[in-house]
């Protein structure tokens, strides 16, 4: 444990030297948030033998073990010591990401870091600190979204644990998460969030499909496929309106006209979602997303994960899904 803490503190020192003091407070919360996570890690073997741990938690962790084995053997993902431990951090999200766009643009603001490169979000281990940062961005005229994140990859810098934040996931959801995060250890391009997340999304989808088909879960395939079809329909709706908003913002018109058209489009978007929900027999999966005071940042953050998905899906099909 002391070795891990020393390593994290050294990392903070290196980052501070590279970045200057102006960003030191942000890096401090990032490093000490990671230290907190590391301090709560327990080896999976230890947790699985601890009868004081709820049975449903141990069963989900056993599934995680099987999933990492499958990820390495059947999906070709690098596993190593990733997900061979468990951490209960006693909160619903591990970090909160802040995404911001100009009021009349769909291009997200980026932040650059020594390790991850430039990314279109800024993560906080504290919800309150995320909200404070979001407030400063709003005061500067940005559209801002805060999104809770249940897991993330340190890209092999640390041995990432399974977190309590995902223990309630269904089996296919946990499979998707594990495949997604492991894919970042296979390929991660600095300064290209859209490529990285789109690639991970396709690996997640294909890996989960293979796992369901190869591990005797026929009863889960149809519900999973239904969920993914609805997800794709909803994402397509978001991407369509993102493009419409981009057209409005690029038009040779006054800013007041653009602002008015933006609100009109948000109204149309909500109406189309209501139609989808009716077609889905009242499925409320995306109600929480829709309940927010929608702005450009919500549409931009979704685009990060799905922009190149059709391209990667085509490449996968061209190579016979191998």
Map each language-model feature to its residues.
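Acidic/His-rich structured neighborhood in mature extracellular/periplasmic domains
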Residues: 67-231
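Bacterial Sec signal peptide processing site at the extreme N-terminus
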Residues: 17-42
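Acidic/histidine-rich, surface-exposed loop or edge segments in extracytoplasmic proteins
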Residues: 38-53, 111-119, 292, 309-310
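Pan-zinc metallopeptidase signature
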Residues: 236-322
């Amino acid at each position: 444990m002391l070795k891990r803490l020393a390593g994290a503190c050294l990392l903070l020192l290196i980052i501070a030297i590279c970045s200057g003091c102006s960003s030191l407070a942000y890096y401090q919360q990032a490093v000490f948030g990671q230290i907190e996570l590391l301090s709560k890690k327990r080896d999976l073997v230890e947790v699985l033998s601890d009868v004081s741990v709820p049975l449903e938690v141990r069963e989900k962790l056993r599934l995680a073990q099987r999933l990492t084995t499958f990820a390495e053997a059947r999906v070709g993902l690098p596993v190593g010591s990733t997900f061979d431990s468990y951490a209960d951090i006693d909160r619903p999200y591990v970090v909160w990401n802040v995404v911001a766009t100009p009021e009349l643009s769909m291009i997200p603001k980026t932040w650059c870091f020594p390790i991850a490169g430039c990314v279109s979000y800024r993560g906080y281990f504290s919800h309150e600190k995320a909200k404070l940062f979001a407030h400063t961005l709003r005061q500067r005229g940005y559209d801002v979204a805060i999104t809770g994140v249940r897991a993330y990859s340190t890209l092999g810098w640390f041995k990432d644990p399974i977190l309590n934040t995902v223990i309630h996931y269904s089996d296919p959801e946990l499979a998707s998460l594990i495949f997604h995060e492991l894919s970042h250890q296979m390929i991660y391009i600095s300064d290209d969030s859209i490529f990285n997340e789109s690639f991970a999304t396709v690996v997640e989808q294909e890996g989960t499909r293979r796992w369901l088909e190869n591990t005797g879960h026929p009863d889960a395939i149809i519900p999973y496929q239904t969920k993914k079809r609805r997800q794709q329909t909803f994402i397509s709706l978001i991407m369509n309106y993102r493009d419409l908003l981009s057209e409005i913002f690029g038009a040779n018109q006054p800013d007041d006209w653009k602002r008015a058209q933006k609100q009109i489009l948000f109204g149309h978007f909500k109406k189309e979602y209501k139609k989808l929900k009716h077609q889905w027999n009242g499925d409320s999966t995306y109600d929480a997303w829709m309940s927010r005071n929608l702005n450009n940042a919500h549409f931009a953050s979704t685009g990060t994960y799905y922009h190149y998905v059709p391209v990667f899906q085509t490449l996968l099909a061209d190579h016979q899904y191998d």
